[in-house]
Amino acid sequence: MHNMLKKDFWYDLPKELIAQEPASPRDSARLMVLSQKDDSIQHKIFRDLPDFLEPGDLLVVNNSKVLPARIVGIKQPTGAVCELLLLRQVKGDQWECLAKPGKRMQVGTKVSFGDGSLTAVVDETLEDGNKFVTFYYDTETLYEKLDEFGKMPLPPYITKQLEDQSQYQTVYAKELGSAAAPTAGLHFTPELMDTIRAKGVGIAEVTLHVGLGTFRPVQEDEITDHKMHSEWYSISEETAQRIRDTKAAGHRVIAVGTTSCRTLEAVAAKYGEIRACSGTTSIFLYPGVKFNCIDGLVTNFHLPESTLIMLIAALYGYDKTMHAYKVAVEEKYRFFSFGDAMLIL
C-alpha cells in the first residue's frame, strides 16, 4: 500500500449537514450501523443501539467532563477585552492557555474576569504562541470560578450558542479536565443506559481529557509525518479487570468514542494487555496500524482529513470508510460534534 496522503481522506460535505445543535432527545440522533462481517450498512436511530449488543459485551465510555474553559476578561489597566481558553493544568493554579489577542498579552499582563474575583497573570509565552498563566481567585477551587464565568469551548464550526451548557456534556461526565466533549457519548440518556445494562451488557469507564489538539488539522501531506497531540488518560483497576474478563470470555469490547478507543489501544500497545494505569498518550491510529483491544466502536462523523477519520479507516478499512461517508452525505446524516452516530461492529 502506498504511503497514505492527507488528501486521501478528503470528502465533500455540504455546510448545511454540519449540526449546529444536538438532537433532542439525545438518543433520537440517527445511527449508521456498519458490519465488519458482511460490509452491510443499516440506517437506524441511536436508541436502537441495544439491538446490536449481546449479553456479555462491554461498552467503554470516557467519563471526562468538559471545563467551561473559555473566559472573557478585561486587561488591567487598559480595559481592553481579551479571551483565555484553558488547555491544560501545568501545576497548581498555572495553566497553559490559548490567548486572544495573543500578541497583546505579553508576560506580566494582568487580566480580571467577572466581578474581579478571578484574575490571571501571564507568566510565559511558549513557542507556539500559547501562554502559561497563573490564576488567582477567592473560592475553594478554580473550577467554581469557571462555572461562574466560563463558557463551553465549542468547536469553531459550531456558530450557534448553546441554550444550556449541559448540552455539551455527557450524562455520565464526572472527571473535570476536557477542552472538548467526547462527543460519541452525547447520544446516551440515563434510560438508554438502563436498557443496555438490563440486556446484560456492561458499561465501564475510562478517563481521557480531550485536548484542543483533537481539532488541530493535519498539516503534512504524508499522514505518517503528522505529530499527534498528547492527552492525559487513566484506567482504574475495576475497569481493567472488566475488560480482561470480557476478552477472556470471548465477548466484545466496544469503545464509545475515539477517545475511549485511543485510551484502550494506547495501553494495550504499551503493555500487551489492559491494566490499571494513568499517563499521557499521543497514539495515532491510521490505516496499517493494528488494533489490540477493541472489537467495535461508537463514534460520530468526523472532519475531512482529520486524524479521527483516519482512525475510522484504520479500524474499518479505508475504502469502506470513505464509501460509508459518501452514503452518509447522500442520506443527509448530520455531521461532527452535535451530529449523528456510527456503530462499527
Model-identified regions with their sequence ranges:
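Surface-exposed, charge/polar-rich loops and edge strands
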Residues: 2-345
